[in-house]
Amino acid sequence: MKNILISCISKFDRNKLDQGAYTYQNHDLTVTAYQTNEACLKYLLSRLGADNQLDVHIRVQSNDVAAPGDFTMEYLNGEISRFCGENGFTVPQYFDVFLGEDEQYHRFDRVLSEISKEVQRIAADDPDITIHLDMAGGKRDNFIFIQLLTKLLSYYGYSIHAYYADADFGTKTGTIVNTDRSFQHMEVLDAVNDFVQHGSATALRAAFSKVESPSVKALLKTMEEFSDSIQLCATDLSKKLEQLDQQLEQVEKYVDDDSNGLFMIKAMIPLIRSKFHISHDSGSRGIIGIVRWCLENGLVQQALTIYNENIADIIYYEKLISIDMKVHGTEINRMMKDRHPSEENNTRLLYVLGRVFDNMFDSPDEDDNDLSSTLGRYRKKSKERTDRYGNRKYNNYEWTIAAIFFDEKYLPAGVRLNVPSELMRRIFSDSRFAVCARNRVNHASNIDTYENLIISLFNEKHYPFSSYPNTFTPKNVTKDMKRALDNLEKALDGKE
């Protein structure tokens, strides 16, 4: 294992030796030093000891410190050599980096590159690296540099610790403070951002690996399950959304702000709620919010799948359509035979569309509207509805196109629209589009002839989709799906 200390060196004038040394303490370790970098370096050498030595000291020097004749480095080199000799420590290898005359951010880029290359050179011989950061020295703008450096090195997976020398000029005493927590807070911020931007809880689990709070542990478990549900497009997303809401509330109520720095995750809870549209009564709007979140974060395949898995439930549970089961229950239950219970609401809607199909083509006055005589009179009434409902595998895919013509005049008795028929037509058209788009994404192939006919019919009915026929891109699918979500929300708003 290799230990590397990185310091931004503060200028130290010879006349300060006359002012006397400071006594710095950290728990059971006490060191005497005139200069803050000296204090941190002596503390770290003492803490590591002779057996677990400090191997390399990377020293970032400003122009003032590096100027010929300056006393700073002369003093530090001599004092550390003396200190190591007296205590049986090995003097670390020095690697000096000079800020130079570059414009501020250019020199930061150069210095970061030099330090990164040196650390990688050391890691080539021994990848087990621990980085120690001396936060006590340098000019004020070096804090920005240290933050950038910490972020850069953390991506390599190194263990990082930070220290600050806090002195009382009146009493000539000071404390060596471990400032690891500030970087842990940054890890939490990054982890929460990873969750709200990409739906991943892996970084959160790592950031809170040592937290003992039952509420936080339960929240992390729920966030991981929620993340899995999004990634796998699971059907239990509504349940996971409700559980996440409950666990966020538990942390808000029962976790002390100051316990183990957990205030940071509490501070991020409003962001989590906002990004995922989480509220105590999310329901269908919560699912719509998650689909929208997927679209906003480039998860188009997940958005299409989650939408398709939930659209029937939203339409039925939100009562956009009402079905009198006394009238239609027997037929629907027969269609449900051998189907999974989760398909119940989808089956109800397919049944309604099938009856609309029947009513449309039993009407002698209905125009064909062309398009190959309305798709070959719906493929000869879908082979007479596959022998009049005799086979449960009849082609739902073909007759759901009836949704495009969905009009209250075709509704069977006992079925009622609770939103305007034009809006309902759009919602069914959206759902048809989402199926076509998902099939194309999942199968990684071009849409087939029948889907082309469907999209052409959409366009004839003045409801064009950006993604078809020749512009099937994530950007255009996202645009079409956002419009689909807007239509659903309009329907929910009009119903309330």
Regions found by a protein language model. Name each.
Residues 133:
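Conformationally flexible catalytic loops at phosphate/diphosphate-handling active centers
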Residues 1-130, 145-496:
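Long, low-complexity, Lys/Arg-enriched
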Residues 137-139:
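Hydrophobic/aromatic interaction determinants used to assemble and anchor large protein complexes
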Residues 142:
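Short, electropositive, low-hydrophobicity segments enriched in small/polar residues
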